[in-house]
Amino acid sequence: MQANYKISDFLEDFLIAKEVEEGCRPSTIRAYRYDLEKFIKIVGDIEIDHNLMRQKVRLFLKVLKDKGYTKKSISRKIACLRSYFKFLNLNEFISQNPMNKIRSPKIRLEESLPKFLDLKDVQKILTSLQDRTKFRSKKSQRYYLMVRLLYSTMARVSELCNIRIRDVNFEKGYIRLRGKGNKERIVPVDNKTLLLIQKHIDNRIKYNEDEYLLVNTRNEQLTPRVIQNDIQIIKKKCGFSDSKIITPHVFRHTGATHLRRSGMDISELQDILGHSSPNTTRIYAKNDITKLKQSYNMMHPLNSNDL
């Protein structure tokens, strides 16, 4: 007689398999856990071989849609459930995979393009961060440095957290980042941000070069969650609407889009962003519809007076 296993019974086994067998990063594991726990919270911790599991999945997706989740976010959760039920099926915990007939929503090109800030938005944030009537806390200097680093280096939030003092080369003007798969890359930094980093370090009572650059008042490394929360505080105090999407990753997209608009070659941008494939970087070329339109107007024969 088969045991009546619940959805949650194999969650830990699934996450261990993802980490050990597939080498998923801690952030990916956390995302899987979050999505599966969200699923259980909405549909209940029902039996994994429930004959209405496919209907439960569709109910879950409808709840997400009604709550305003984006198609991209819903697609991620579908991918998570698909992976989990495939794991259960391969290990013969379930006889059929309920995700077989569940399709991901179609995402239009404009929905899949990276979100980025206009230059005036970046200027507004940097100017506001230096306004002591808006930002008066001891964290204000950290906020300012954090935003400049995100925009200047286009680092992922985890990469930003992992910068150590020794990774900053003041003489040559670059920072060493550790990206996905612990791959290292060197990214240039503007002079003003370098001076700000030096001032930030000098303000510490004592330090050594192995310490992290961004730390809290207890000299502990900042976590991605802390930086994400800081950015939301900055967004609110700068007066942006709730609908405006501003996250650490948006600054990465913003820096990349602005560099591309200024004429940076895709291969150079790929090196800065740490993309293993140039196809990932090419999406920033699609973002620049303004430049594309200008080139079109200049070069297409139909825009000449002769036709």
Predicted segment positions?
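Conserved catalytic core of the tyrosine transesterase superfamily
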Residues: 1-307
